[in-house]
Regions:
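Short coil/turn connectors between adjacent alpha-helices in alpha-solenoid helical repeat scaffolds
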Residues: 1-5, 20, 40-58, 93-111, ...
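Tetratricopeptide repeat
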Residues: 4, 8-11, 58-65, 111-118, ...
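Short coil/turn linker motifs that delimit alpha-helical repeat modules in TPR/alpha-solenoid proteins
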Residues: 19-20, 24, 47, 54, ...
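Intrinsically disordered, low-complexity regulatory regions of eukaryotic regulatory proteins
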Residues: 25, 78, 98, 103, ...
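Conserved alpha-helical positions within TPR/SEL1-like repeat arrays
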Residues: 26-41, 79-94, 132-147
């Protein structure tokens, strides 16, 4: 893990030296993506306190990735923002799965927020890729609500299951367009 992080930090340093602005930004984005993924994968495997710190690092790298993606031009910029929003949503989702009570609810809320942004961006893409990205976002939203419903009780649980079903039905409608 340490060697991978070191390698990707070197990749980031080299990317910052590139003269072509768009290429520079894209390569920095790629390095931030790899760093975020390293911390994310380690956070999933780690124990509670260590896991929390690793998730924070994963979020930090993905927020930087999102900032960089907003500077990229055209469809590539939108696609990179979608990718960053997805990973941010996953970071919060995985933390929510490990948490309990109000902390879990807040983390699920953060996950939903990022997956909604992912969906909003996916709607800006045309063609089958845009539809596929919307399907991915609807799946992630449905999964968030489903897992929240599993942790909730009574009426709150029923409402969350309803929202999960709604997103998965939308996912199915989109899939029929492919």
């Amino acid at each position: 893990f340490g060697q991978a992080v070191e390698h990707h930090q070197q990749q980031l340093r080299l990317a910052k030296q590139l003269k072509d602005k768009q290429n520079n930004i894209q390569e920095q984005n790629n390095a931030q993506s790899s760093l975020g993924r390293c911390y994310f994968e380690q956070a999933i495997k780690a124990k509670e306190e260590t896991s929390k710190k690793l998730f924070e690092q994963a979020v930090e790298h993905n927020l930087e990735r999102l900032r960089l993606a907003k500077q990229l031009e055209g469809k590539n910029g939108i696609q990179e923002q979608i990718n960053a929003q997805h990973l941010l949503g996953q970071c919060y989702f995985e933390q929510a799965m490990k948490a309990e009570g109000e902390a879990s609810e807040q983390l699920f809320g953060q996950a939903v927020k990022h997956h909604q942004q992912q969906l909003r961006l996916a709607k800006q893409l045309e063609d089958e890729n845009g539809i596929q990205e919307q399907i991915n976002a609807q799946f992630s939203l449905g999964r968030c609500y489903f897992e929240q419903a599993m942790k909730a009780e009574g009426e709150a649980s029923e409402q969350l299951f309803g929202q999960a079903v709604e997103h998965h039905q939308q996912q199915l409608r989109l899939a029929k367009q492919l």
